[in-house]
Regions:
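Hydrophobic/aromatic beta-strand patches that form the interior of the parallel beta-sheet core
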Residues: 5-9, 26-28, 146, 177, ...
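Conserved RecA-like P-loop NTPase helicase motor core
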Residues: 103-205, 209
Length: 219
């Protein structure tokens, strides 16, 4: 009735066959100060993630990282007012970058404008809500993705990764920068660090090559 079972081609196989861009994950674990670790050791998940996305030193790190990258960069966030708008204001209008912003309130016509600008330039930074961009905007010319907000959703993470995997003329490679936060205190491991470990399992199962970098977050 159903016919023979066909094996689904993996993402890694599609990359090897040159249907998708070469893809690398750079995991950046931000080491927070002992003072902040102690402060957050009993925090609930919602309080921890709110503290993380509103941390000005972390956001400054994201800004400096994005400005240092070549090609078009997509920065994905979850919370519009608490994070997206804050990042938008922090970036301002740097001389050598084209800054674009997308959240759920941006209509279809403006989203199309974003797509056109990104497809025709190689110095664009797009600050976008992950919910909007994971399914709602189709841009091939993305060279870098920065996960600015932690998430453990397999579907959303893979949808977001898919933004960078599409090949385009002149683009052969894409890099994901997965930013994690180590707020562990003694034997206690913080919520979002556990979620990062779940994302690591996704990268492993999808056979994405990855490297882990540990950085002391400067206060």
């Amino acid at each position: 009735i159903f016919g023979p079972v066909k094996k689904v081609t993996t993402t890694a196989e599609l990359i090897e066959q040159k249907h998708l861009a070469d893809f690398t994950v750079k995991c950046i674990i931000l080491q927070h100060t002992d003072e902040n670790r102690n402060l957050m050791k009993k925090a609930l998940y919602k309080d921890e993630i709110e503290w993380i996305v509103m941390n000005k030193h972390r956001n400054k790190f994201i800004k400096n990282l994005a400005l240092s990258l070549k090609g078009n960069t997509l920065i994905l966030f979850q919370f519009v007012e608490k994070h997206g708008k804050v990042l938008q204001e922090m970036f301002g209008n740097p001389e050598d970058k084209i800054m674009l912003y997308v959240d759920g309130n941006v209509d279809g016509e403006l989203r199309e404008d974003v797509r056109v600008v990104a497809e025709s330039n190689d110095n664009v930074i797009i600050i976008a809500s992950s919910g909007t961009f994971s399914t709602g905007v189709n841009i091939k010319n993305i060279h870098n993705i920065i996960f600015a907000s932690p998430s453990k959703s397999r579907v959303r993470n893979l949808q977001s990764v898919g933004r960078g995997l599409r090949r385009s003329e002149g683009k052969q490679r894409a890099t994901l920068y997965d930013i994690a936060d180590d707020l562990s205190w003694k034997a206690h491991k913080n919520h979002t660090l556990k979620h990062f470990e779940e994302r690591m399992k996704i990268y492993g199962s999808e056979k994405f090559p990855y490297k882990i970098y540990t950085i002391q977050l400067k206060e």
